[in-house]
């Protein structure tokens, strides 16, 4: 738990000091590698509300800076059952006024490019997003679903 708290604290420090970015990626990346005693992915016992006091300032800062939040489909690939960040965090992002998202897949191999993008799109629509963003010359361009 302390490692997770430190992870979020450092992330907020980072985006407070360095603002020359377009998309904040890997918001809850640390959960991809947390396992329970049986070796199961940690995402199943990660509750947004448990870390809301650390996550909300990050989301608010992303919105304040008019940056995008990456939704990464690798969570599906690694058995978490959800993308990163998880749906509760994405709901909160919307509630706080966040609209800009990008979609990534950690496609370090050709077969992982755009991994489960259709599944992710369905989830994002269900949550209330109507599209995602790409960047061209660092300028955001909205792509509607």
Task: List the predicted regions and their residue ranges.
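Extended substrate/RNA-proximal surfaces in nucleic-acid metabolism proteins
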Residues: 1-64
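Structural preference for beta-strand elements that scaffold enzyme active sites
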Residues: 22-24, 66-70, 100-102, 131
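Conserved, mostly hydrophobic/aromatic
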Residues: 26, 69, 93, 106
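Active-site-proximal loop/turn and secondary-structure-junction residues that shape catalytic pockets
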Residues: 28-33, 73-77, 107-109, 138
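Histidine/acidic-residue-rich catalytic or RNA/ligand-binding cores of hydrolases
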Residues: 33-39, 79-90, 110-122, 143-145
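C-terminal regulatory/interaction regions
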Residues: 118, 125-135, 139-145
């Amino acid at each position: 738990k302390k490692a997770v708290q430190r992870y979020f604290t450092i992330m907020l420090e980072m985006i407070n000091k360095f603002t020359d970015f377009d998309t904040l990626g890997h918001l809850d990346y640390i959960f991809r590698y947390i396992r329970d005693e049986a070796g199961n992915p940690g995402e199943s016992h990660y509750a947004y509300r448990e870390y809301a006091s650390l996550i909300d300032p990050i989301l608010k800062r992303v919105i304040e800076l008019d940056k995008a939040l990456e939704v990464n489909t690798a969570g599906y690939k690694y058995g978490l059952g959800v993308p990163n960040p998880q749906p509760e965090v994405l709901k909160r992002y919307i509630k706080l006024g966040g609209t800009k998202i990008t979609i990534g897949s950690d496609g370090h191999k050709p077969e992982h490019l755009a991994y489960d993008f259709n599944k992710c799109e369905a989830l994002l629509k269900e949550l209330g997003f109507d599209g995602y963003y790409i960047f061209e010359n660092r300028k955001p361009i909205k792509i509607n679903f």
